[in-house]
Design a protein with these regions (language model features):
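A common structural junction motif
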Residues: 143-149, 182-186
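Conserved PLP-binding catalytic core of the aspartate aminotransferase-like
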Residues: 113-144
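Solvent-exposed alpha-helices and their adjacent loops that cap or buttress functional pockets
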Residues: 5-9, 21-25, 68, 117, ...
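PLP-dependent enzyme catalytic core of the Aspartate aminotransferase-like
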Residues: 155, 159-186
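Flexible, glycine/charged-enriched surface loops at secondary-structure junctions
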Residues: 87-97, 112-118, 152-154
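Active-site C-terminal subdomain of aminotransferase-like
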Residues: 21-106
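Conserved PLP phosphate-binding loop immediately N-terminal to the Schiff-base lysine helix
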Residues: 1-17
Length: 186
């Protein structure tokens, strides 16, 4: 959803999940290593099987994984990547996500919410309701309007909810959500 240039940032490892910016079901972890990161994997003992990426790198050379992955999710990732390419590539996808985020954030300003961050990423907008439980907003939108937003758990359950901007969402979805939020105030 936002540009991430490992080389420019000097990052040696990037870890994400299939459910993040690709908007696929959860179940696949994606790890990208810089050449320096690969060297570190081969030259250091990870101490346990789960953090030892040597087998994953060796299997990757032959196009395989060391363990059976969630094949259905891999196929969905493949399909999603093809759709991103067909729609103009990663820059076009990032532009679409940014446009959705900007549109939503501009419209939600008139409602009784505070932005949790002054510089949020484009994938999600966290909001703090001023006078009602965040979890109650989540359940009302889900049960009465058939709209899903992202609830928080733990100490933040009643204080913050999140609105996502990735996947097959449109400006019309933003309009429907804003209208539902306005209707809930009546």
């Amino acid at each position: 959803a936002d540009e991430f240039d490992m080389k420019a940032l000097g990052a040696d490892v990037m870890i994400t999940g299939s459910q993040k910016a690709l908007a696929c079901p959860p179940g696949i972890s994606i790890i990208t290593l810089s050449p320096r990161g690969v060297e570190r994997v081969y030259n250091h003992d990870a101490g346990c099987m789960y953090f030892d990426l040597k087998d994953a790198l060796k299997n990757g050379e032959r196009g395989q994984t060391p363990f059976t992955p969630a094949v259905g999710i891999l196929r969905q990732i493949n399909m999603r990547l093809h759709k991103i390419d067909e729609a103009g590539g990663e820059e076009a996808e990032r532009g679409k996500i940014k446009a959705l985020a900007d549109d939503f954030r501009q419209r939600v300003k008139e409602l009784p919410f505070d932005f949790v961050s002054h510089s949020p990423g484009n994938a999600v907008t966290p909001l703090h309701p001023r006078n009602v439980s965040a979890y109650d907003i989540f359940t009302t939108l889900k049960d009465e309007y058939h709209i899903w937003i992202c609830p928080n758990g733990g100490d933040m359950r009643d204080r913050v909810f999140r609105v996502g901007h990735i996947g097959s969402l449109t400006i019309d979805d933003n309009t429907r959500l804003i209208e539902a939020m306005k209707d809930m105030q009546k």
